[in-house]
Amino acid sequence: MDGFSQRTPQQALAALLDRYAPQRLLLIGERFPALEAFAQAHPHVQIAVASPGPLPGELAAQRFDLALLVDCLEHLPKRDGLQLLGGIRNLNASRVAVLADLSACGWQETDFFALALQASEKFQRDAQVLNLFTYDLHEYKQVPDWLNAKFWANPENFGKYWW
């Protein structure tokens, strides 16, 4: 991901919303035009909004189809941001998307990679560069084709003996 995307961040977020079509959405940060358009087109979607920081108890106890962090990490100390993002990824959502200005939040791409997020797109507007990182549990680790009884030392004994 060396070059900049031809799309705008709003277009990329709109495409993400269309692709995943979440029924329950968690937004950390401020609402944005692409989200408003999605909400109008899909009035049945439940959207929970929280400000940057620790999740309120009622949201922390819920699962969401998609979590979006937009204009969020720039307003948190890095340690708090890591805890928030890791907690959401582990406990609250199977899919996560983060739009961040790395120079404003003090993060590096490797910080996102360490949390198993992938660099999806990079956007530039004047001097500002925004990065979109995504995580999808369903695409994170595919089961290798060799991980089955056919390739075990004694596949005929699979399920027969316990030692």
For every predicted segment, state its role.
Residues T8, R79-D80:
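Short secondary-structure boundary/capping elements
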Residues F64-R79:
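A short SAM/SAH-binding and catalytic strip from SAM-dependent methyltransferases
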